[in-house]
């Protein structure tokens, strides 16, 4: 029998300690991983609701289980809010993740062995855009495009590759690209070779929802996203379209369920509904505007301190810092900053001489720090601290600089908590 006063702390102290330690880590570390964000207490409340218990195979109004009347309300709320948020005609809120959303799109539009054209992982793409280690590069014949030495997409190169390989589907989207993608140009290329245009907007969905980054819906046949990252909701996936083709919509529905998934995670769908409602609020646009302002402010500090920023700047929430000139590695920078309670991730940069697990750069993102209240002055100061640590790498004062920086980080984290008590 269950009682309301059952706790993890009493039942499983080892697990509870790990949860408490993670809570403390998030509060005492500055999070700059571009794909991470903080979900609101409302989102987490929905994830912990009794919908955790409910099986709901099928779609609203057409379920394979009884007792789904409230699950139907939740899922329809999420669908309707996502349609309003992004201007979509079709929405599927059931994908468990961005990768599963992408798998469902491939399954709906093309067949095994067909050719896809996507951005190279080493140039800022994603595993599911055709990387050979991913299902997308194993099931399908993947051809990859990249970026120029300046860190920009070369659309003529994309076009030439499309003309050569005649893909059935072109993937546009990224995991580490700091500029604005020309969705219209990508659609033009897709139309020229008779391919579908599939956009993965996972990294910039929040900016798009706020009207601060070009919306791909008017140009793409199908769009996917995660619901965390810039969007700031639960970890999950989403498929959208405004192509007007009912046959494509039907194929997408059946490709999610029953082809790729069984029962949806109704508690996560409830959390998605909360997230979409939050994103429709006026203050959400202000938040996303500050995300971009903070990224631009940090870029200027890195450049002033002598570090190269890929593409020379950013037009979204992230940027890449290259250490090729300094002879440093992303791995060493990642580790040193981590000791100072600043979390980033090592990342490959254009013409990177290092191996993928070493790299010559880091990726920096501002959604999390902005959500906890950092303003432009705060992030300029933060970028300066990061440069102090990077400047000291391999020198006698390295540990001293790291220790001094950590104290500054702890102080600002105390002033700007993630979840104020």
UniProtKB/Swiss-Prot annotation:
Keyword check for Amino-acid biosynthesis: yes
GO cellular component, as recorded: cytosol
Pathway noted in the entry: One-carbon metabolism; tetrahydrofolate interconversion; Amino-acid biosynthesis; glycine biosynthesis; glycine from L-serine: step 1/1
Main location group: cytoplasm
SUPFAM superfamilies: PLP-dependent transferases (SSF53383)
GO BP term, example: glycine biosynthetic process from serine
Site description Plays an important role in substrate specificity, residues in chain: 228
Enzyme Commission number(s) of this protein: 2.1.2.1
Function: Catalyzes the reversible interconversion of serine and glycine with tetrahydrofolate (THF) serving as the one-carbon carrier. This reaction serves as the major source of one-carbon groups required for the biosynthesis of purines, thymidylate, methionine, and other important biomolecules. Also exhibits THF-independent aldolase activity toward beta-hydroxyamino acids, producing glycine and aldehydes, via a retro-aldol mechanism.
Protein name per the record: Serine hydroxymethyltransferase
Organism of origin: Haemophilus influenzae (strain 86-028NP)
């Amino acid at each position: 029998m269950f009682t309301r006063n059952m706790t993890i702390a009493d039942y499983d102290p080892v697990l509870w300690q790990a949860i408490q330690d993670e809570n403390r880590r998030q509060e005492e570390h500055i999070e700059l991983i571009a794909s991470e964000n903080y979900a609101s207490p409302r989102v987490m409340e929905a994830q912990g609701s009794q919908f955790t218990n409910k099986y709901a195979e099928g779609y609203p109004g057409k379920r394979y289980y009884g007792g789904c009347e409230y699950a139907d309300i939740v899922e329809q709320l999420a669908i309707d809010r996502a349609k309003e948020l992004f201007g979509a005609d079709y929405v599927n809120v059931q994908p468990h993740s961005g990768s599963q959303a992408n798998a469902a799109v491939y399954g709906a539009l093309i067949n095994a062995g067909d050719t896809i054209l996507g951005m190279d992982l080493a140039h800022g793409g994603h595993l599911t855009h055709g990387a050979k280690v991913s299902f997308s590069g194993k099931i399908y014949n993947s051809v990859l495009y990249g970026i120029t030495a300046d860190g920009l997409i070369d659309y003529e190169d994309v076009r030439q590759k499309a003309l050569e390989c005649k893909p059935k589907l072109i993937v546009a989207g990224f995991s580490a690209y700091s500029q604005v993608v020309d969705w219209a140009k990508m659609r033009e290329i897709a139309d020229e070779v008779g391919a579908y245009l599939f956009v993965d907007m996972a990294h910039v969905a929040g900016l798009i929802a706020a009207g601060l980054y070009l919306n791909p819906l008017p140009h793409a046949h199908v769009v996917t996203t995660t619901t965390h990252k810039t969007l700031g909701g639960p970890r999950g996936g989403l498929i959208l379209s405004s192509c007007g083709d009912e046959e494509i919509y039907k194929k997408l529905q059946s490709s999610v369920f029953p082809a790729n998934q069984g029962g949806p995670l109704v508690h996560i769908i409830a959390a998605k509904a909360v997230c979409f409602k939050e994103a429709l609020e006026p203050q959400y646009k202000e938040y996303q505007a500050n995300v971009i302002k903070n990224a631009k402010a940090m870029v200027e500090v890195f450049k002033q301190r002598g570090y190269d920023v890929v593409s020379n700047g950013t037009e979204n929430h992230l940027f890449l810092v290259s250490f090729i000139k300094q002879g440093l590695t992303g791995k060493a920078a990642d580790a040193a900053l981590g000791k100072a309670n600043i979390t980033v991730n090592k990342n490959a940069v254009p013409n990177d001489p290092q191996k993928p697990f070493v790299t010559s750069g880091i990726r920096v993102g501002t959604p999390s720090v902005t959500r906890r209240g950092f303003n432009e002055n705060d992030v300029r100061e933060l970028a300066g601290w990061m440069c102090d640590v990077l400047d000291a790498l391999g020198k006698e004062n390295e540990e001293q600089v790291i220790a001094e920086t950590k104290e500054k980080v702890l102080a600002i984290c105390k002033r700007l908590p993630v979840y104020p008590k």
